[in-house]
């Protein structure tokens, strides 16, 4: 039987194997906790660590233990004044195999705090959306970088060795340690050779010759002790990762908040906005998010008001498009910003206003936007009623004319989280760049 040894380093001195087993065991509870946090938190908070609370009863690992109401067992217990050897003790009547003094039958309400990493949060968030595996990997990757020279380092790969800086350090060290030079030693060797061939050498002459030989031997020993290139001299080219310079993008979130948009519809819309934000974050360093909500009138609001305000009323969709156009002209010129828009609605609109919406898109907004996505949130039972894309509300039919003319416009109906991802296939797939007409 083969044995597999996991030698991966544990992150931050924690047990990786135990962590993975816990995530697998408590996956449904963690998914529920993440869903609640996404529902109540900000769009930008999804792409970060999360501190998740879950009931403590779901933390312990399942174990085998003897049943408390059956079987025969022998114990060695400390002495006492109530029982003697041979006494029969009644079995405890606690249910469910609970052991220990005072074990109750109620469920513990204590909560367990668990910190999920960014990658684990995204895994749980993407699970309901049914994203392809490659798309999940791309969204979880950090921003793209390029290598840039950043000085020198004492360690590195042999292929990055800097010969010039290494020889410069070697030269300075040899000067500081007075390493004998080759010319000096060659001059002494030549002098020794000349004295050795001279005839009639006297005692003084022989003494001088011996001194030269000793000096040459001393210089050779010193030269061997001081190497030409020492490991301390070696320098390597150092590189650091520099983020690729990207342009800025602004993401407009438009949503109908009339009485017909319930909590289910708003939850699906928020998932759609979160996914679009994650896609854009992969492409741009800076992303501004503008929230515009509308009933019979529209206005720019903060995120909390956008999702949780109780305001309701009639429905005039064109007011949201007019507000978006006003904000673009005031703060986000198209020559400096990449403009993306996502509109969520149930399709209800006042009579005659849908044509006004199509006109605003045709004449103004589609010329400014890199991409405009419209999602119509319907009930799952309505998916059979709207069998073809031509059927639908007046707003859907009006937007179909825009979809036919502008390649950077995408529209779809969603009834469940798994329907959200197809909206992004055309936008982020490999395709020719969209030519926005002027």
Swiss-Prot record:
It comes from the Bacteria. Residues 1-16 have a biased composition (Basic and acidic residues). InterPro entries: UPF0229 (IPR006698). Residues 1-20, 83-107 are annotated as: Disordered. Residues 94-105 have a biased composition (Gly residues). It holds the Pfam family DUF444. Belongs to the UPF0229 family. This is UPF0229 protein NGR_c12350. It comes from Sinorhizobium fredii (strain NBRC 101917 / NGR234).
């Amino acid at each position: 039987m083969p044995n597999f040894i996991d030698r991966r380093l544990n992150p931050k001195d924690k047990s990786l194997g135990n962590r993975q087993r816990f995530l697998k065991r408590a996956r449904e509870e963690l998914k529920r906790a993440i869903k609640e946090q996404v529902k109540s938190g900000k769009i930008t908070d999804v792409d970060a660590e999360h501190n998740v609370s879950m009931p403590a009863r779901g933390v312990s690992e399942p174990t085998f233990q003897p049943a408390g109401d059956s079987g025969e067992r022998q114990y060695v217990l400390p002495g006492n004044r109530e029982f003697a050897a041979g006494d029969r003790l009644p079995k405890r009547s606690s249910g469910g195999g609970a052991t220990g003094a005072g074990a109750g039958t109620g469920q513990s309400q204590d909560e367990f705090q668990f910190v999920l990493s960014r990658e684990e949060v995204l895994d749980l968030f993407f699970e309901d959306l049914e994203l392809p595996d490659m798309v999940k990997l791309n969204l979880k990757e950090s921003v793209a970088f390029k290598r840039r020279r950043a000085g020198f380092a004492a360690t590195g790969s042999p292929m990055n060795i800097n010969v010039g800086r290494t020889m410069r350090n070697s030269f300075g060290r040899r000067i500081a340690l007075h390493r004998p030079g080759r010319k000096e030693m060659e001059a002494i060797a030549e002098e020794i050779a000349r004295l050795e061939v001279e005839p009639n050498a006297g005692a003084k002459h022989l003494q001088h010759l011996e001194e030269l030989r000793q000096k040459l031997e001393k210089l050779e020993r010193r030269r061997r002790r001081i190497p030409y290139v020492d490991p301390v001299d070696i320098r390597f080219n150092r590189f650091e990762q520099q983020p690729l310079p990207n342009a800025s993008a602004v993401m407009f979130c438009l949503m109908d908040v009339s009485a017909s948009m319930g909590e289910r519809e708003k939850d699906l819309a928020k998932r759609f906005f979160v996914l679009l934000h994650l896609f854009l974050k992969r492409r741009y360093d800076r992303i501004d998010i503008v929230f515009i909500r509308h009933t019979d009138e529209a206005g720019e609001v903060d995120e909390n008001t956008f999702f949780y305000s109780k305001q309701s009323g009639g429905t005039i969709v064109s007011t949201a498009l007019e507000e978006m156009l006003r904000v673009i002209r005031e703060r986000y010129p198209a020559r400096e910003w990449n403009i993306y828009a996502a509109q969520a609605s149930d399709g209800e609109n006042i009579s005659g206003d849908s044509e006004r919406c199509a006109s605003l898109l045709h004449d103004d907004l589609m010329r400014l936007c890199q991409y405009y996505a419209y999602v119509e949130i319907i009930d799952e039972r309505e998916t059979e009623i709207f069998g073809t894309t031509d059927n639908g509300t007046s707003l859907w039919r009006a937007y179909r004319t825009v979809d036919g003319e502008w390649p950077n416009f995408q529209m779809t109906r969603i009834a469940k989280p798994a329907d959200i991802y197809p909206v992004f296939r055309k936008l982020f797939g490999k395709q020719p760049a969209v030519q926005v007409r002027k």
